[in-house]
Amino acid sequence: MALREIIKKGDPVLEKHCHPVTRFDQKLWDLLDDMRETLAQANGLGLAAPQVGILRRAVLVVNDQEEMLELINPEIIASEGEEDGLEGCLSVPGYWGYVKRPAWVKDRAHDRNGNEFETEGTGMTARCFCHELAHLDGQLYTDLADRIYTTEELDAMLEEQGK
């Protein structure tokens, strides 16, 4: 396993659509292992392959049970409700924004061996699924947020609100 560099906003790789994974082999396993190590080191809740420079449909999401899920060729197959919530991104460090996302989502994906499965999540897990899957289509949360806040602006705003 190896740490990979997390690509930052402005790199054209983050604006591209990713290709489906067609081979579930050692190369994929190495990528997933590297992404696991990179995400753990960065202390994030999710990481998509394009964030480490690989244009493949693979993401990691930490769910509400603090399990790190690997989703290969994921797709959202159902969703309900809507919540406005705060998001940040490892590719956009130091900035935050409020984004509307579904309150509940159900995903279909494959595991590292190519076995299909479904998973679902609410709240932050649903938000993470949506956020990471958007990366696979070249979209950042900054494209969806009404306003972007610096960490300092957000801290001041939350302090005013008593949070």
Regions found by a protein language model. Name each.
Residues M1-K163:
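Positively charged
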